């Protein structure tokens, strides 16, 4: 299959700027990965307000992000990240052990942490009288805190795509402020201080700010 030197990343055409998800929409993960790997990318959009048949043809759940790389089309941010990471050793170690450890921690960020933190966050913001996921989230975050208190990075003593994804999961505002976890906080700060994150975050914010300006 043919791939290209420039990826196409798809995101939403607009999100509310006031108390909205700008800065956290998951195309940021893919922009960030491209910045880390030195891969050029273009951004295309699908409407937030009305899901189109084209959108569902590219992402069967009507979500973002998804990417097009030549003849290859991929949805789900984790799958997209692994595709990008395999293009460059800045994100994925070239040795079998490093690659395996990176894969396991990338999946752990999605399946062991985010699968708890997102429903917990949703119950928090919707004003649920009781959040039955709090103890579960506490357990997951405590395990991560213990690991990060002993190492700077998750894999191979260096930054990988696993750190990109784990930090993006942990930096969600309510999750980040839930409890006192100094090692996790230092980790989030260390990862998000990287120029690639700063560039990707600024690019996403500029995208949504420009879209918002056309509505005012």
What function would you assign to each model-found segment?
Residues 1-135, 139, 145:
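GST-like domain detector, emphasizing the conserved glutathione-binding G-site
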Residues 54, 179, 184, 210-212:
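Residue-level signature of transmembrane alpha-helix interfaces in integral membrane proteins
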Residues 4-5, 97, 106-195, 200-203:
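GST-like fold's C-terminal all-alpha helical module
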Residues 202-216:
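Terminal-tail/helix-coil boundary detector
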Residues 50, 194, 205-208:
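Intrinsic structural disorder
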Residues 14, 46-48, 158, 202-205:
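Residues that form or immediately flank small-molecule/cofactor binding pockets and catalytic motifs
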